[in-house]
Amino acid sequence: MPPRLPLAQAARCCQASLTARPSVPASSPTSSLISLFAALSVQTRSASILASLSDNRGAYHKRIRKGRGPSSGYGKTAGRGTKGQKAHGHVKPWFQGGQTPLIVSHGRKGFVNQFAADMSELNLEKLQEWIEAGRIDPTKPITPKEIIKSGIIGSSIKDGIKLLGRGKESFKIPVTITVSRASASAIEAIEAAGGKIVTRFYTKESLKRLVEGKSLHTDKPLPVGKEHVEEILAQARSLKKKYYRLPDPTSRWDIEYYRDPAHRGYLSHQLAPGESPSLYFKVPTGGEKVKVVRADKVKASKTGDVASEKLF
């Protein structure tokens, strides 16, 4: 469709047609309409712009149709040549030209831990940016629920959230935050700004329940012992809605991590003064090491002394 004539230009044309024919009385509506259409009919408009439209250079790649005749340059063998592995099929991606494969001559190095927890990473500079934008309230405790719902780590929920220390130099906002794990630099920056950080054990399912409102957040573990059963049941019965409790760690590595005060773990209160967070290794004592001598060696040394006394 040709482009429309601008209104200003059409008005000028109509005015020119009326002034050019003074013999026709202006009171006749038929004659005035005829003169208007006559003025418009003499206007010539070019529609050749439609024929000159094209894509930018490099925006369009012509489709190559192979095996459609010799004039295309890709007929018969379709650019593959005649016979051979490359014409009939393709070389395997791991083939190295016939030499001894590097994986055979040098062996496999390293491994990928299939059981490692997949953590969502959160840096301090991103946290400060979200707080300054008003997307996270620093006056309230920041839990994984607030972090996930704010969209700061994306929409996908993984096995936990790890706080990292990039941007620690400019982080000056005191916050109370709970995450799955935290680096030493992030812990130092949070506490230097007057905030508090706690690391707690989560799973992918427990994080989903937190976001959906099916669990209540707490930084205290479930008490163990028969004396606590009635109290916990009474609290659960007093609530109108049934909630899932947050899980506690069961593997040795997780228990030792959250027992460590250096990680600000929520199980660190279980340690006695001077006790190691490890479940296996104990803190060495400051006294001298007592040498244990086997009884048979003591007996053998005594008989040797008696025999030497008899000889001399």
Curated annotation (Swiss-Prot):
GO terms for cellular component: mitochondrial large ribosomal subunit. Its main location: mitochondrion. InterPro entries: Ribosomal_uL15, Ribosomal_uL15/eL18, Ribosomal_uL15/eL18_sf, Ribosomal_uL15_bac-type. Residues 63-89 are annotated as: Disordered. One of its GO terms (biological process) is translation. It is found in: Mitochondrion. Residues 70-82 have a biased composition (Gly residues). Signal peptide: none annotated. Keywords: Mitochondrion, Ribonucleoprotein, Ribosomal protein. NCBIfam families: rplO_bact. Component of the mitochondrial large ribosomal subunit (mt-LSU). Mature N.crassa 74S mitochondrial ribosomes consist of a small (37S) and a large (54S) subunit. The 37S small subunit contains a 16S ribosomal RNA (16S mt-rRNA) and 32 different proteins. The 54S large subunit contains a 23S rRNA (23S mt-rRNA) and 42 different proteins. Component of the mitochondrial ribosome (mitoribosome), a dedicated translation machinery responsible for the synthesis of mitochondrial genome-encoded proteins, including at least some of the essential transmembrane subunits of the mitochondrial respiratory chain. The mitoribosomes are attached to the mitochondrial inner membrane and translation products are cotranslationally integrated into the membrane. Belongs to the universal ribosomal protein uL15 family. This is Large ribosomal subunit protein uL15m. The lineage of its organism: Eukaryota, Fungi, Dikarya, Ascomycota, Pezizomycotina. The gene is mrpl10.
